[in-house]
A protein has these predicted regions:
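Structured secondary-structure scaffolds
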Residues: 1-291, 308-346
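Aromatic-rich surface patch/π-platform used for binding flat ligands and interfaces
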Residues: 305
């Protein structure tokens, strides 16, 4: 049996604004489009308001003090960080009626009425802080001239496992405060999976430290990783990866929104040779002088050179279109095909 203990908590209203949020979400471009449904499915199951207070030791303190008779609350000036459990209200704090939130005066003028005040000991839920991210980077409250130009924030890149938390609560806060969509674009990527197709997690012990993969090959260092498989622990090894090979692998391995397998051995086998070939092509091309006029094509080119320039322009057009649509996979695959196949052969 589970014993249910009723405790008073702080909540943010959210059930009343769900329809308006859906309207605002329609203004956001999702990448891939299908992953918008993750968010909508979660919203379909919201039936209560958002409990934002937690009983923990470490996090952002809820900036509230209570009067002795608990009929009033004291709040600090906007933007002030306080620790109510150990500090008194700072200068400029205001007193509100607890039931109506009516502002009834300054803390300094009402100290006798309030009696012995008590500071809130609870802290905010972690997503209460994290949902400020788009507002913060856009200059909300601090840089209004920038905020007017920068909001809605251009892009939110994130994984699909936190759509119901980070993405949803960020959009909720933007809707409540500003009645605007929180972003112009939302990029929802897949999850990193182990070689057996399982999500990497601490509980399974099947994770691979990214720093060790990036350092593999630097200064002659080799990489070795012990990964817990379904039946036994497997030792994976690689000699040369590094940051550039790692980036190329991630860009080429999966389309946006798809899960991707992380196996250092395969990263080295598939992409180190590709990276080396691209480097050699670039080094060969760098031996020649850059023409003064890159916009016009010389009249005396042979048919093979005219063909490769046509192919190059087609590649650049496709790459620019892909980048504009935040499709890194298509852009990188197109460059890889041209840079390791068509151009070297020419």
């Amino acid at each position: 049996p589970v014993e249910i203990i009723l405790l008073k908590e702080w909540y943010v209203r959210q059930t009343h604004i769900q329809d308006r949020m859906r309207e605002l979400i329609e203004e956001i471009e999702f990448h891939p489009v299908r992953n918008r449904q993750f968010l909508l499915d979660w919203m379909d199951n919201i039936s209560i308001d958002w409990p934002i207070s937690r009983r923990r030791w470490y996090h952002t303190e809820i900036p509230i003090w209570y009067s002795e008779n608990e009929e009033y609350v004291i709040v600090p000036p906007a933007g002030t960080y306080v620790q109510p459990w150990r500090e008194n209200p700072p200068a400029g704090s205001r007193v509100l009626r607890r039931d109506s939130r009516e502002d009834v005066g300054s803390f300094e003028a009402m100290t006798e009425t309030l009696g012995n005040i008590t500071g809130e000991q609870k802290v905010f839920d972690t997503w209460m802080d994290s949902s400020n991210s788009n507002l913060f980077v856009s200059g909300y409250l601090n840089q209004p001239e920038i905020f007017d130009k920068a909001f809605p924030t251009a892009l939110r890149p994130q994984g699909k496992e936190i759509v119901r938390t980070w993405l949803y609560y960020t959009l909720l806060k933007s809707a409540l405060l500003l009645d605007k969509p929180g972003f112009q674009h939302v990029w929802i990527d897949g999850l990193g999976m182990d070689p057996w197709g399982r999500k990497m997690s601490k509980s399974l012990g099947n994770g691979i430290d990214a720093d060790s993969v990036l350092e593999c090959g630097a200064g002659g260092r080799t990489g070795s990783w012990k990964v817990k498989g379904p039946e036994k622990t497997v030792n994976l090894k690689a000699n040369k990866i590094g940051s550039e090979c790692f980036r190329l692998w991630k860009a080429c391995e999966a389309q946006v929104g798809d899960d991707f397998h992380i196996n250092p051995e395969e990263i080295e086998q598939k992409y180190f040779g590709v990276l080396t070939k691209l480097f050699n092509v670039a080094r060969f091309a760098s031996q020649f002088d850059v023409p003064n006029d890159l916009d016009s094509i010389p009249d005396d080119l042979n048919i093979e050179d005219e063909w490769i320039l046509y192919e190059f322009n087609a590649v650049m057009s496709e790459v620019k279109s892909a980048w504009t649509n935040l499709d890194i996979y298509t852009a990188t695959q197109t460059l890889k095909t041209f840079g390791t196949g068509i151009l070297p052969s020419h």
